[in-house]
């Protein structure tokens, strides 16, 4: 396999393990362990770690090794702070660029309760993909490439956080469905100011719930 392909393979596999929390936040990694686990040489692994450091997923310290970047309550608050700045702004200023067909599709989906009910972990995990697709649609409609690029970094961290706290998310699932419907109704009515305000409310409620879930996770893992 060509060297560039090996670098891509190493990057993809290590990144997936970090995002899925198989390599947990705060855990220590080293090149020897990674080369053995992936069946690759040091060069592609080292290259992958450099890329992951640029993404904020690992911290590389000379003579101390590699640490998977921790996810703290402060990090979570900062992620939601950025979302609160960007997503309502996009709706208010670029909402008219959103594809009406996709808005209608999402509206129909959020009107239908999950087959397994709101209290199941399976429904919660399925909601992650739906929620991610909905918010990605909004951000991708923004023509400002700098907003899209900076948002991409928090998407990765947000995905990692979701994996970390999946078991506790079911408590907020039903409310999230309702909040998404309210945002979508405003979008379909082309009331972008109202859509932006409902997005602010949704993001703030999500932030409060996320902080609670983080504390639950830390308590559970400390036991």
Where are these regions (language model features)?
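Residue-level recognition of short, well-ordered coil/turn positions
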Residues: 22, 57, 121, 191-192
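Short linear motifs at protein or domain termini
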Residues: 1-97, 212-223
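Short helix-capping and inter-helix turn/linker motifs at the boundaries of alpha-helical repeat units
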Residues: 5, 173-174
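Alpha-helix N-cap/N′ positions at the starts of helices
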Residues: 86, 175-178
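Conserved amphipathic alpha-helical segments that form helical-bundle/coiled-coil interaction surfaces
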Residues: 91, 96, 100-165, 177-186, ...
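A short, mixed-charge helix-start or loop-turn motif at secondary-structure junctions
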Residues: 1, 31, 72, 116-120, ...
């Amino acid at each position: 396999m060509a060297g560039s392909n090996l670098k891509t393979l190493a990057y993809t596999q290590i990144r997936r393990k970090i995002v899925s929390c198989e390599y947990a936040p705060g855990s220590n990694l080293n090149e020897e362990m990674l080369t053995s686990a992936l069946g690759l040489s040091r060069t592609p692994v080292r290259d992958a770690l450099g890329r992951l450091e640029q993404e904020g997923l690992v911290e590389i310290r000379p003579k101390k090794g590699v640490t998977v970047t921790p996810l703290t309550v402060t990090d979570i608050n900062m992620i939601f702070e950025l979302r609160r700045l960007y997503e309502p702004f996009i709706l208010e200023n670029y909402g008219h660029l959103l594809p009406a067909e996709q808005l209608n599709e999402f509206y129909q989906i959020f009107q239908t309760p999950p087959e397994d009910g709101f209290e199941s972990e399976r429904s919660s995990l399925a909601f992650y993909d739906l929620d991610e697709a909905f918010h990605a649609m909004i951000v991708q409609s923004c023509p400002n490439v700098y907003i899209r690029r900076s948002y991409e970094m928090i998407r990765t961290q947000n995905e990692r956080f979701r994996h970390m706290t999946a078991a506790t998310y079911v408590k907020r699932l039903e409310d999230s469905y309702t909040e998404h419907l309210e945002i979508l109704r405003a979008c379909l009515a082309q009331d972008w100011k109202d859509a932006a305000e409902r997005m602010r409310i949704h993001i703030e409620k999500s932030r409060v719930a996320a902080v609670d879930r983080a504390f639950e996770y830390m308590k559970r893992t400390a036991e």
